[in-house]
Amino acid sequence: MRARLLIPILFSVFILSACGTLTGIPSHGGGKRFAVEQELVAASARAAVKDMDLQALHGRKVALYIATMGDQGSGSLTGGRYSIDALIRGEYINSPAVRTDYTYPRYETTAETTSGGLTGLTTSLSTLNAPALSRTQSDGSGSRSSLGLNIGGMGDYRNETLTTNPRDTAFLSHLVQTVFFLRGIDVVSPANADTDVFINIDVFGTIRNRTEMHLYNAETLKAQTKLEYFAVDRTNKKLLIKPKTNAFEAAYKENYALWMGPYKVSKGIKPTEGLMVDFSDIRPYGNHTGNSAPSVEADNSHEGYGYSDEAVRQHRQGQP
């Protein structure tokens, strides 16, 4: 009986226990960014930019339009994982047979009455409601066993409010210009360009995971960069490069056993899934694209976004 009860309880504990991964809200955190995060963010950005296919732009003078998704947010998670014994409880109680005997006192009452030469005799027997003697007997042995498991997990996970650092966007813009230069493609001001290149940075951030599986634990930090780009000939408004997507993920992982270690540390970078929605299937209603490009002033009103400072300066000098 006891074995049949404990076996499913133990099985349920291991199946339904807090073995999972908690993903925190992506954040650079407060204060100075630590070196590992710098390395991952830079690696994912470099890989995404380096993988751009720019063969169609060879020998052309291009103007770059770079837009980066802003990321603002904050989050706080307090308390650990759920308690296992709040969901699964096993208890076995074996109680002995108990018998109690009570002895109640009895008394006899006799009454005699005489009336008109007649005599009556009445006898009654009564029992008191309070026992004079109580005897309790127990047969067999008693036992009690219980099973419970409490896993607190990780608690008090906090994230600081974050805002996209303009230097991050400027760094990404400089990486793009560096790759164009190394590919032999001239990046010039919009006034001197014959080609417009549009680069939209949809994802440029970090993800932190913590995995707990009783014996095995892991900490993982990931950085992702996902972008979409296309190029348009200014003369005939035709697409030189149709919308393409690049997505790369750099990861740093520490493996633990019972949170002792880490016994293994690994780093790597790989292509990841693309954008949930891209523009590769969009076609112009006519034979060419629109006649106007985004305004330099409108798209680069914030320092560090879009063109490099030098490109904006050259554009302004060319248009007094």
Swiss-Prot record:
Lipid attachment residues per UniProt (N-palmitoyl cysteine): 19
Gene: mafA
Any single biological process term in GO: cell adhesion
Designated name of the protein: Adhesin MafA
Membrane topology reported for the UniProt record: Lipid-anchor
Segment forming the signal sequence: 1-18
Span list, region Disordered: 288-320
Positions where lipid (S-diacylglycerol cysteine) attaches: 19
Localization per Swiss-Prot or TrEMBL: Cell outer membrane
Organism: Neisseria gonorrhoeae
Keyword entries, A-Z: Cell adhesion, Cell outer membrane, Lipoprotein, Membrane, Palmitate, Signal, Virulence
